[in-house]
């Protein structure tokens, strides 16, 4: 049975409709007053539709975008049916809902025993009755009078509604609806659904030979100010189709990488759309720690060299270290700004053929310099004016060079000094480094001992910096902790790694013979916080000998994420 009509219209009415169509012109009929589809733009910001159940996601998407419709499409909760049904829903401009009731009945018939031997209570109300109620409630909320049922859907379950039922077969669905439905594998994908044209008004009329659809919906005008991101998981087809039916543009991401910050396609789509409302459609987006920040940040359009906004995994940073115009503190200060940028790019280029990762030239600029004298503020640290750093940062931004500003605070604390450079840290290409070697106790002076900092103080800085990043819709920042002795960071296991706005890196600063440096490297890795990235420093004068780029990539294991030259 390819198609059938259940409680649609009487035979005489259907025949009258056919006869009327024979004598009419090709002009589309005027829609009935109650046939208009009404959509609504979601609230400003990000709406994440991430429930584990695809049928629930479809309902939530419908609630987010549709106020009323005379007709809905209901598909069996399986891939074949939903991809075919999606084409009909988008052309008609109506929601696509999923009927998961058959699965729920089967699951509820044989409940899994709990550890006590008694049947488990169903999680999240996923029994047959609640699922049926959720679907029925949504159809009632929408005011739909007609259902197009595709696949293994119980047409009798819709009560007094008119039902046009079709097997999950393209030919059957064409016969049932009079619409052009494709069963080409290329058309049965989330990407193909996203590419379907938005519904057009007064054109979606089934042929005279089709099963009756009454009243015929009049699609709403495409929603403006809204964009959707979905995944390529088949279970997201219904939610995605509902978004397209509302005229919402959609971009599809891999389900295994459902992160706007990591996707050039998502960044470009969000930036170009400039939308006030964003829908994230897919269970995979549920892993995002802060979806709203991720969307706001991606929408800025900023990308690191190599694409995306995440710092590590597929990038290697190669940095020059030092202070502006102070050659004794490192190679960064040995030349003017243009020459520094060129030297950074040349140094980084030596690594390009040694790794599959994108190599990013970097500057690590000492912003507060450890001092032998207390100075007017008594903190044994000279704070450089932001105006001395800005030319480097601006030139770096133009050249695709990342920047890290380094703090050597003396007797003050890291947070106090970090706040002095808030205007610089508010730039997307600027990270922050803390150098505990130069963190003094109230009665200490530099070079008489190695300084240290507590995890608690580090966390006060990371809390503040993460808040800045989130508030300003900035991409994740590199947050560097310099260390070459275990006691330089007290209670290192308590360093907060939970901020999605920061990507932390321990920078091994040891100098001297390579056996000693390798021993330090191994010691620092022991019991380090999970998820930490790693940096290695090559000293031109102090290392015996300094590693070549080839040796750095070959001999330093695990492989480094940042190589700094001083």
Tell what function each PLM region has.
Residues 1-29:
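Secretory targeting and sorting signals
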Residues 229-230, 256, 448-565:
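Surface-exposed substrate-engagement region within the catalytic domains
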Residues 308-313, 342-358, 393-398, 421-429, ...:
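Acidic (Asp/Glu)-rich catalytic clusters
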